[in-house]
Amino acid sequence: MFGSGNVLPVKIQPPLLRPLAYRVLSRKYGLSIKSDGLSALAEFVGTNIGANWRQGPATIKFLEQFAAVWKQQERGLFIDQSGVKEVIQEMKEREKVEWSHEHPIQHEENILGRTDDDENNSDDEMPIAADSSLQNVSLSSPMRQPTERDEYKQPFKPESSKALDWRDYFKVINASQQQRFSYNPHKMQFIFVPNKKQNGLGGIAGFLPDIEDKVQMFLTRYYLTNDRVMRNENFQNSDMFNPLSSMVSLQNELSNTNRQQQSSSMSITPIKNLLGRDAQNFLLLGLLNKNFKGNWSLEDPSGSVEIDISQTIPTQGHYYVPGCMVLVEGIYYSVGNKFHVTSMTLPPGERREITLETIGNLDLLGIHGISNNNFIARLDKDLKIRLHLLEKELTDHKFVILGANLFLDDLKIMTALSKILQKLNDDPPTLLIWQGSFTSVPVFASMSSRNISSSTQFKNNFDALATLLSRFDNLTENTTMIFIPGPNDLWGSMVSLGASGTLPQDPIPSAFTKKINKVCKNVVWSSNPTRIAYLSQEIVIFRDDLSGRFKRHRLEFPFNESEDVYTENDNMMSKDTDIVPIDELVKEPDQLPQKVQETRKLVKTILDQGHLSPFLDSLRPISWDLDHTLTLCPIPSTMVLCDTTSAQFDLTYNGCKVINPGSFIHNRRARYMEYVPSSKKTIQEEIYI
């Protein structure tokens, strides 16, 4: 095994370790040990702690550390063999990461660095940290008995006074670079999924998604939404809550009794459990879709059922489109196998802090550490606090977000850009975000050689922008510039011809941006969407005309339409009599402008859905293996949603700041927004052209 003489490896029978494991793992941490899990623990303890595993405290300390990691990862109650191996491997990886930062040149041995597979690879042994929570082992002397002072010695922690550099925690992450995690609904935890290219898959297999990705895409969305609903405060202590309760309220109104109302609780019922339960009231959660008959249906992992929305009363303030997750209440009739919906709403949202705490503070973006098969990086709470304090101190940092549709082939837009860049050059921002489309005409393959091709014109447009930027040295030297592609930009426009293409959209190819790369010191060609990690904040940038798509595909409810007809008839009758009630002439104090209502509806729908594109594939195609880059779980700290079909807005929902700069040119004015991350405030700016 190993050449060190401090540990004498022994073979421990699992029943001998059971009393000690039961005392630590079961009684103290409430875990249950399976026989194969106990065998794996006995094998590790015998190999790495040796013959003195009963006398010294090393075994107890290892079991306590093992249980802490197991509970932190939320692996459940039962300790099995595969879980033991994964947790032990992660404990090794954690000590490697900690050791590489704190003691990079020491080469002693830690008991977590010893495995059976290392017998012929002694050069790969992990060094032991002098501050490890497990006792150090001498290479030349037998295992010493620790003193009382050593037993209660706390692990070494870096000094909190060590200065942090904000540049180390500022990173732009494209869709292809974002780490992928799959969701296990049974264990209710995220599992790291390695990149195909890292697995050595070459050729087409490394680029095309698997059919399994297609299957898991909507299943993952459903399970994440279902778990979020069950974490809602109204579902706490039990899953018996009905957020709609329209039928019960109607019954109470008809009875007109003052006695104590009965509970209107209902459980979320799987669709398959509707069979045989005729004329009963249910609460369902599922995906809104159309079946093969062309009628509306609701789907969940257990099945699907046709729904009747002729008498549905939807909750106001949401968009209902095919592909979104909805909560519906109604009555199921076995005749026709149809579910008659009485009420419909979207699942409730959840704040970012609650979601992060639930998933164990996973570092999904890989800023504080890169995850792999054996190690899952997590956000350090103390570091998050220090980053937040540093963020508050950097009051001079600001992000400038230009409006969308920066047509570089339009002379009017180039003139406006010149004025804005001149103003920004005096006080350069930390970040300058450019959002496409960067050409007014979609770039496509030209069938004629008489005129200049559209791709050549596309490159010339960026060369002209590089010439313009070269006049502002202060800006190009001190500002990081991010370019987000639009629907008219390459390569997606070659297929979509300016229509909405597949998400996520790849960055603009480097063949068209060489001159800008030479002029600008810090430039990032990002995907759409893209994410920015800035200290303690996560910022999502998404360029899409979502408001227009929601309005085109929203579900129309016949009951609401009939009410609108009655209202119009009443208005016509009141006009004929020339008598207008005074309350119709006075605006209600809580009545909001139409634009504000539309923007709130847009933001609430996206964040409550937990997805940037809650549509069916037929309405908005998505790369199956990159659907995780569109997921908003947890919701970001700030989201830049650039939508030219919606009004310019700035609002906060569930702690998430949502900004829409709108179109760049509007009524002979060039518009942009300044975002100050230290205070999370925005300033709307405009320049007349």
Curated annotation (Swiss-Prot):
Q: Where is the composition biased (Basic and acidic residues)?
A: 98-115, 146-155
The GO terms describing molecular function are:
DNA binding
UniProt key word Cell cycle: yes
One term under GO cellular component = epsilon DNA polymerase complex
Give positions of region: Disordered: 98-155
List every position bearing Phosphoserine.
122, 141, 613
Question: Is Cell cycle one of the keywords UniProt gives this record?
Answer: yes
Q: Give the Acidic residues compositional bias ranges.
A: 116-126
Which spans does this entry mark as compositional bias, Polar residues? 132-144
Its post-translational modification remark reads:
Phosphorylated in a cell cycle dependent manner during late G1 phase. Phosphorylation may facilitate the interaction with POL2 or the activity of DNA polymerase II. Phosphorylation is independent of DNA replication but dependent upon CDC28 in vivo. Both Ser-141 and Ser-613 are phosphorylated in vivo, but in vitro only Ser-141 is phosphorylated by CDC28.
What is its biological role? As accessory component of the DNA polymerase epsilon complex participates in chromosomal DNA replication. It is required during synthesis of the leading and lagging DNA strands at the replication fork and binds at/or near replication origins and moves along DNA with the replication fork. It has 3'-5' proofreading exonuclease activity that correct errors arising during DNA replication. It is also involved in DNA synthesis during DNA repair.
The UniProt subunit note reads as follows: DNA polymerase epsilon is a heterotetramer consisting of POL2, DPB2, DPB3 and DPB4.
The record's comment on protein family reads: Belongs to the DNA polymerase epsilon subunit B family.
What protein does this entry describe?
DNA polymerase epsilon subunit B
The top of its lineage is: Eukaryota, Fungi, Dikarya, Ascomycota, Saccharomycotina
